[in-house]
Amino acid sequence: MPKTEEHDRLAEARAGREWHRWGPYLSERSWGTVREDYSANGAAWNFLTHDMARSKAYRWGEDGLAGICDRFQVLCFSLALWNGRDPILKERPFGLIPSEGNHGEDLKEYYFYVDSTPTHSYMKYLYKYPQAEYPYCRLVEENARRGGQGPEFELLDTRIFDEDRYFDVFVEYAKADTDDLCIRIEAFNRGPEAAELHLLPHLWFRNVWAWGENRRREPVIQPGTAADGYVTLVADDTDAEGLDNLPFKYSVGRRRLYGEADGHPLFTDNESNFQRLYGPAADDGRKYVKDAFHRHVVNGEATVNPAARGTKSCLHYRRMVAPGGSTVIRLRLTAASLAAPLVDVDALVDRRRHEADRFYAQIHPKGASEDERRVQRQAFAGLMWSKQNYIFDVDKWLDGDNTKLPPPVSRREIRNKHWRHLNSMRVLSMPDKWEYPWFAAWDLAFHTVAIALIDPDFAKEQLWFMLFEQFQHPNGQIPAYEWEFSDLNPPVHPWAVWRVYSMDRIRSGTADRAFLERCFHKLLINFAWWINKVDSQGNNVFEGGFLGLDNITLFDRSEKLPGGAILEQSDATGWMGLFCLNMMRIALELAKENRTYEGLATKFFQHYIYIGAAMKHMGGRGYDLWDEEDGFFYDVLRYPDGHFEKLRVRSMVGLIPLFAVERLEAKWIAQFAEFTGNLNWFLENRQDVVRHCVNRISGSAGETLALTIVGPRQIERMLQRLCDPDEFLSDYGLRSLSRAHRDAPFVLGGNRVSYEPGEADCKIKGGNSNWRGPIWFPTAFLMIESLRKLAKAYGDDMAIVDRAGRRWTIGEIARTHAERLIAVFVRDASGRRPEYGSIEKFQTDPYWRDYLTFHEYFHGDTGAGLGASHQTGWTGLVASLIDEWRAH
């Protein structure tokens, strides 16, 4: 593959050059997060609201529009806007909190991650800013009025974009060098009349000085040189005290923000406005505070520092934009003192844009259409823009910074008290920087698979961070997410480690054994934790826990069940089967150079066999998770007195045992003498358990062992449902719940599960997600991968005939599901994108129709995007699907 300029930068970064020092690491929402919650009751969304955010200094991380910062978030840059009508300066995206949204928290803005290279040498972002007053109150009131049953009331529904009275604000970043960033902001007036727009590029320091018993020395921003054609802001932390949770001295030094000459510099401090937040009696004597620019620009108050210095600054531009016209602002953030800093900004932006084109031309598969390339590139852009500084010291957060002003003691018992070791200053891949601006371990595993296509080093780094001592618990558990690090998530980390390692080895030609080995050692600890914690009966059947599929069952699986009942879960057991197979595969890879690992490969093979057998026999209790009558796996509710109840819900839970699939070719494993010997002994002497999980397939190339928790007949019966449009096969991929439950809901003890293809009617885990019918990319992706393994093992010998009489091979089933997932985003024959449903603005308007959002999940019947609108995280897997299914 020909190398491009971006490939060269990635190689330089691997060698130590800091191309990643600056990036889109600024969050889009720090208010309402657990990190900023110091309440007595753990009500994070109410402790620091959107309305308070403009006035309160954040403790653990900043936010903004189209923002960037350095990798430790010392110095931040973002854009604020004002249309002359809004009641507040638009400094950060707005959305509803869970108690306001009729389906949980919900972003109410339109912005798009248009482009980004892996080193962020080029980035592009689009924000659509209405010219009329933003309807904050109406959005809150109407969504509250609708309740949980009605559709969400969106910003477009307010008709604020009628007659195209809005600005398209594009922000482009281009790195001239590692510490030299060119910034180009262009705002287009799409409306029929001239309109004024205030643009305020912000430059500020994160507040790290105000939290302890004694204030630390502060950095400063002051005016710099003003010459023909530009003004300057100079930020300097040289004399400030450094970050206290890094083992080394770090500063950004002296930085200059050059801007066009009509920008008026404004200065204040990144300090809380105590009087506004807590009343007049709370005055701490500080005159220049965080919300000064809002009050100055919107209300005309004299709130900025006339001495022209502070820790927060901006350049205030006022531009009148003609109808159909645009205005451009050029800026440059650099360590260098430049005589003509803005002269070559346009040329540098253009150059980096063309380099990005060349880079992605090498990434896109040959068989991808122009529209599929657009989808893939914007998916990569979303993954890159979703990087965020995740700054959180749980020990300090629990106890408070200032011993003289400690937070309420009660909060120590609410969440995360067992995670005091967790201390992050890392740049992490977020699920969604507004809706989920915190890492989620199982989400992150899926992110890395798509990211590895363009930046395998970053993908490997992300996987290792979750296993690093400052994240992984000493007992072996991988932290789930900040709302409760102790929650259980599906153990997909070994799968991601193995897959990213394999992708990197194939593409680079070099096997990163060191990465694989160190991850394997930490995953051994994690496996031991799962065995000791979650298999409470020691019968290789796993129970309890959240496991990521929020509302898929009758109960909230994070909570204990009444009466001492235990939920024995087919998905938990299936996930553990997948865990075992991936660990076996990694151990065999490591055994190529160190035969010691063959014994561990045997261990995980045997664990897998016992898990598979247990799903069939449940320790001789007279029931199992497989239901022969229905041909499906069901959860079992087991009571203390020994009686049990099958939960006959046909959902993703019952399909997950299909994920636990691997194939071993006899010729390939022959190189591992000890493993092969142990394997053969097991096959010959433990037929009672092996016959359920190992199928020998003879072919022209020799014998293949198909390792499957489900036997061939069971596979065929499950495949029937995967091909049935009245069950799991949607026009847009794999449904999470069978459509059969539309007419036949499952009811038990007043709880009910029915087919809900759109938003959820219940509010388990906040209510903003739904696993009772919609399509989810991560589980659909794993299903496709499992089907491909089965197809390679069985070939065309295993096939099913659907109810319509069509014959399906396993490979055809896999391709059908993959094609339908890709079709969610790609224009159909009529030019419409299913993900945008019936929203005509997105379907037909030339300024909207080619800007994509990668929603959290998708309607089970229409493919319309639902949930978080920027969860490029795991929905970015569409980039992997395009890569794999358009290779030729």
Where are these regions (language model features)?
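Acidic, mature catalytic/reactive cores of soluble proteins
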Residues: 1-59, 65-67, 72-73, 80-888
